[in-house]
């Protein structure tokens, strides 16, 4: 992170602070119109995000072919957007059928194409496939994928078309062929489409009294076990929830350790402190995405003597209900006896702690009240605003793809 980026984010945070003092919400920032972000085209055979299509970090697993006679056919909706040209080789209208998520992304992309190249429209060459023309388990069979070009079929535009598709919110974009761009989305009910940076509601936090309570029951005024900048255990004020979604199903990483045994559920985009060596001081453990933790690495856990390294035995995924992301004064927290960050989405713990400083000031001064669980649903407005500001300053690759899905859907 270069210093100017930090300064810009701090300035953005200061703007949010002044807006919050005036109206308890992000509002509209008045000032000069921002310069458009410079976009870089995708290269031939490049895909984004840089993971396989049918994985958690992209469009998710194949869920089965949809036919006109199947129950799931009702999940498909026709797209009659006049700004999109559908090739419709089959003359059945099949290419117009797609899931709502795919339709929303495609309509957004159509606007971007017209803005990028006046007089040019988006063209769909393949949408839902009912005839079996694609490879086995293709997302075309579920209406979750489209192959696209520009209406003028200028192949020099296709790299930028792919980039525009990424920006439009497609969950996976592939410069698959010199003749088209392939785009796909998550299923409508996929838990993978609902992953911010959180813990399940039954995960336990440790109070200053020694009592352990579910994170869902945290409230302002409580002090919870955390880690300070020196890597020592401390008790930190709970301020608010950065995410509070008690009823939604989410996908969690399940990290298990040995010597001592611990088990932690957290979403893939959340930060956790990791080292490759047992002898690394606690203060030098690095904050990384939970999705990048591997067996054999070490994470920090709490026991009677303090915070110690524990070797990761296994990492897998599991769905669970409820998602809570507590914010503390120190930006860290001990959940289920494992040290974790309060932050997610960007793999920069120190930067996150800095840009959340204005929000902590608001709570400490009593200008805004701490969040009671019943008062907030979903992602905190400050987190959403910081995310959108960060997208103007940081490179897209610095964001976890699943966090982007959560904040842009």
Curated annotation (Swiss-Prot):
Annotated site, Involved in auto-cleavage, chain positions: 267
Marked site (Cleavage) residue numbers: 197-198
GO molecular function: calcium ion binding; cholesterol-protein transferase activity; patched binding; peptidase activity; very-low-density lipoprotein particle binding
Lipid sites, type Cholesterol glycine ester: 197
Tissue: Expressed in the marginal zone at early gastrulation. At stage 14, expression begins in the neural plate with expression becoming more prominent in the anterodorsal area at neural tube closure. At this stage, also expressed diffusely in the somitic and pre-somitic mesoderm. By the early tadpole (stages 28-30), expression is widespread throughout anterior structures with highest levels in the otic vesicle, the eye, and the branchial arches.
Binding annotation for Ca(2+) 2: 90, 126, 129, 131
Protein name, as recorded: Indian hedgehog protein
Gene: ihh
């Amino acid at each position: 992170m270069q210093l100017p980026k930090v300064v810009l984010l701090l300035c953005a945070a200061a703007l949010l602070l002044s807006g919050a003092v005036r109206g308890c919400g992000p509002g509209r920032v008045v000032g000069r119109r921002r310069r458009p972000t410079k976009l870089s085209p995708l290269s031939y055979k490049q895909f984004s995000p840089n993971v396989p299509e049918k994985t958690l970090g992209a469009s998710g697993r194949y869920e089965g072919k949809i036919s006109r006679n199947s129950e799931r056919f009702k999940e498909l909706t026709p797209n009659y957007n006049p700004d999109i040209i559908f090739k419709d080789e089959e003359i059945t209208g099949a290419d117009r059928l797609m899931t709502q998520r795919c339709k929303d992304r495609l309509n957004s992309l159509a606007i971007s194409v017209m803005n990028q190249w006046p007089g040019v429209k988006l063209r769909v060459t393949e949408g839902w496939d009912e005839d079996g023309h694609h490879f086995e388990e293709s997302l075309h069979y579920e209406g979750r994928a489209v192959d696209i070009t520009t209406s003028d079929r200028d192949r020099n535009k296709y790299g930028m078309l792919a980039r525009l598709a990424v920006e439009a919110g497609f969950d996976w974009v592939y410069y698959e062929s010199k003749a088209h761009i392939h785009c796909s989305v998550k299923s409508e009910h996929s838990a993978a489409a609902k992953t911010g940076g959180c813990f399940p509601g039954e995960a336990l936090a440790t109070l200053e009294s020694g009592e352990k309570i579910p994170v869902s029951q945290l409230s302002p005024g409580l002090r919870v076990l955390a880690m300070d900048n020196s890597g020592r255990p401390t008790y930190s004020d709970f301020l608010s929830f950065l995410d509070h979604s008690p009823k939604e199903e989410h996908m969690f990483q399940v990290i298990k350790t040995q010597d001592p045994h611990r088990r932690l559920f957290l979403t893939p985009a959340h930060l956790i402190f990791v080292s490759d060596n047992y002898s690394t001081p606690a203060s030098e453990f690095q904050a990384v995405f939970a999705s990048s933790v591997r067996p054999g690495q070490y994470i920090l856990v709490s026991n009677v003597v303090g915070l110690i390294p524990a070797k990761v035995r296994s990492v897998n995924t599991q769905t669970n209900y409820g998602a809570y992301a507590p914010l503390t004064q120190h930006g860290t927290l001990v959940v289920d006896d494992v040290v974790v960050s309060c932050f997610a989405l960007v793999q920069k713990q120190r930067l996150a702690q800095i840009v959340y400083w204005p929000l902590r000031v608001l709570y400490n001064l009593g200008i805004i009240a701490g969040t009671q669980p019943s008062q907030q649903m979903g992602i905190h407005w400050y987190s959403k605003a910081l995310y959108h500001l960060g997208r103007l300053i940081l490179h897209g690759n610095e964001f976890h793809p699943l966090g982007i899905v959560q904040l842009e859907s």
